Amino acid sequence: MMRCRFAIAICALLFMLFPLMSAAQTTQSDDLKKSIDSLNDTQKAILKELQDIKKLLANPPAARPAADALPSAPIDVSKEPFKGPANAKVAVIEFSDFQCPFCGRYDKETYPQLIKDYVDTGKIKYVWRDYPLSFHPNAQKAAEAAHCAGEQGKFWDMHDRLFANQQNIAAADLPKHAEALQLNKSMFQQCLDSGRYAADIKKDIDVANSAGISGTPSFLIGTVQPNGSVRVTNKLVGAKPYAEFKSAIDKLLSPPGGGGMQ
């Protein structure tokens, strides 16, 4: 009798454990399937990367000039906004981004002194070129806004205002800046909506890239040629102190064999 009861208990226990064993097998099966799926996804990702690398090797991008390389050909600045005399001996070309904090720092700390000492005295031509960085979402439209203000003779006024209000240059803010500058609002908005300066800004970016520029602010300094183009002799990258600009500019303003400016 005892053996019979023991056998019945064993059977009952096995009957109770069977669903658990089945569930464990199902769980293991699910885990195995997930592992296989994950492995397949990984293999697909690796395969895609290999395919991308193969395409890149087949069509390599054009090599960009080294960061310290200077443009071999003079740069045309005939259609760019500038300050100072058009026929100045020396030109400074700024490639900048209205949303860039380093550009804002340069505009606050160095730019005013350069304007006072070299532009207002007629010694240099100061040229602006756009280089809105792709990770600054407001930079492109801000650049277009400055050129739209330029149609009403206030490019530099908008330039100054955008840098003074870098935290408020989203698309919705631009009409407010136009109003503060007393621009014709409808003309400004029509210009901004048209996007007609986007192509010119893209050309500025291309020129910067060909000159080995990849960040802002960057500056090309050189001598103005008879046709108005600029033969670059110096490159400065970053919000450099005034002294570095002064050194580069004074060397070009000094006569051959002469000393620096007093």
Regions found by a protein language model. Name each.
Residues 1-11:
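Bacterial N-terminal signal peptides that target proteins for export
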Residues 92, 158, 188:
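Divalent metal-coordination and catalytic microenvironments
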Residues 98-179, 184, 251:
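Structural alpha/beta surface segment adjacent to cysteine/selenocysteine redox centers
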